[in-house]
From Swiss-Prot:
Its main location: cytoplasm. One of its GO terms (molecular function) is RNA binding. The gene is rsmA. The lineage of its organism: Bacteria, Pseudomonadati, Pseudomonadota, Gammaproteobacteria, Vibrionales. It is found in: Cytoplasm. PANTHER family: DIMETHYLADENOSINE TRANSFERASE, DIMETHYLADENOSINE TRANSFERASE-RELATED. This is Ribosomal RNA small subunit methyltransferase A. It catalyses: adenosine(1518)/adenosine(1519) in 16S rRNA + 4 S-adenosyl-L-methionine = N(6)-dimethyladenosine(1518)/N(6)-dimethyladenosine(1519) in 16S rRNA + 4 S-adenosyl-L-homocysteine + 4 H(+). Keywords: Cytoplasm, Methyltransferase, RNA-binding, rRNA processing, S-adenosyl-L-methionine, Transferase. Specifically dimethylates two adjacent adenosines (A1518 and A1519) in the loop of a conserved hairpin near the 3'-end of 16S rRNA in the 30S particle. May play a critical role in biogenesis of 30S subunits.
């Protein structure tokens, strides 16, 4: 049997499809999500329903977003799920999640995300952080390491800072390639992202925070003084509690925000 065919569906490379088929891992993911009736659950990329089916056994209604027309059609005709699902056929990267929000019922989003779009998709979802209760995603293990990293580590970068700006990041479980058909070439992991009710370190202008992150991590081996010399003087860095001789990869989220907020208050620079 071909190793890229699962339940009669051939995995499509352009959609980055790898189908989960390990019952032990599936149980672990569903337990982590802990779906309950009445919750506003949204699955991105339900695929062949490996997580969709067990979640469907716990709840009466939920929403799925699926780009692959054949898979969306399959779900519409699913004997157990058809009546429970609201199916949005299309690209989650362009989806306006505010249309799913209900009064006092924030979104609980989950999915086995295609690894080729996981980072831009998370940046898209962060825009809706006020409407989201939590997110559970299967990702490349390397991406989960980046999301959860601390300053000074190799995995620490722009994605880390922006994810931790919006969310508490909790790695949940590791998943070997053998849990999928076809097996990906990388290890995977499940992560829980819980958006803060109140941002712990709010930026006055997000574009400036993204800019200081981008400039810092593009030159992570330079000193902070050299990296930001066109933007912020060494004296101001000292005032902000930033040591000019350290490297950008050692700066905390709080320090990146302090620099961005200084730039927002001093726009002539």
């Amino acid at each position: 049997m071909r190793n890229d065919v699962h339940l009669g569906h051939k995995a499509r490379k352009r959609f980055g499809q790898n189908f989960l088929n390990d019952p032990y891992i599936i149980d672990g993911i569903v337990s982590a999500i802990n779906p309950r009736p009445g919750q506003n659950l949204v699955e991105i990329g339900p695929g062949l329903g490996a997580i969709t089916e067990p979640v469907g056994r716990e709840v009466d209604k939920f929403t799925v977003i699926e780009l692959d027309r054949d898979l969306a059609e399959r779900l519409r005709n699913h004997p157990e799920l058809a009546d429970k699902l609201t199916i949005h056929e299309g690209d989650a990267m362009r989806f306006d999640f505010t249309q799913l929000v209900k009064p006092n019922n924030k979104l609980r989003i989950f999915g086995n995300l295609p690894y080729n779009i996981s980072t831009p998709l998370m940046f898209h979802l962060f825009e809706f952080h006020k409407d989201i209760q939590d997110m559970h995603f299967m990702l490349q293990k390397e991406v989960v390491n980046r999301l959860a990293a601390g300053p000074g580590s190799k995995a620490y970068g722009r994605l880390t800072v922006m994810a931790q700006y919006y969310c508490k990041v909790v790695p949940v479980l590791e998943v070997p390639p053998t849990a999928f058909v076809p097996p990906p070439k990388v290890d995977s992991a499940v992560v829980r992202l819980v958006p803060y009710e109140e941002l712990p370190h709010p930026a006055k202008d997000l574009r400036l925070l993204e800019r200081v992150c981008r400039e810092g991590f593009n030159q992570r081996r330079k000193t902070v003084r050299n990296c930001y010399k066109a933007l912020i003087s060494a004296e101001v860095l000292e005032e902000l509690g930033v040591n000019p001789s350290m490297r950008p990869e050692n700066l905390t989220l709080q320090q990146f925000v302090a620099m961005a907020n200084w730039l927002a208050d001093n726009p002539q620079h």
